[in-house]
């Protein structure tokens, strides 16, 4: 049996670098870092326009069980999130926040994983196509919801902000897990 494998790939959390250690014919341990995926965009929530910056990533540590010592595997472990989503709004005209109208001010918000370290489950397949080389794919979930927070500059009542955040949190609570889809290439040595 060949030992360690190193791999590169892409996932819903960004570009991936992984290291795999096969413990036996049917069991292996896998660690990976995913990151580098970011985007900036605008979104409107209620009357408030936000500039949003999103950066995805984190570290995963998984135990793999290869079904019938085949390419199919079930994986379970943890994902430590390094994901950051920030939102900023600069109010320059009459804008309703909560129950009041504001004409000036700044709102800073963020969305993070509810769990910094969350359970992770996936099913995957490794296809060996040449001596030491394989292609793999995973489909799974990181079991963590998302939590929103916000603060405002002087003059914006936190009670009004809390009402806005409650609306955002209601939408986020509909997401009990973060989808995880990955594809990669490994080399065993």
Where are these regions (language model features)?
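Solvent-exposed loop/turn segments connecting transmembrane beta-strands
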Residues: 5-21, 36, 175
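Extracellular/periplasm-exposed beta-strand and loop segments of Gram-negative cell-envelope proteins
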Residues: 33-60, 82-118, 144-180
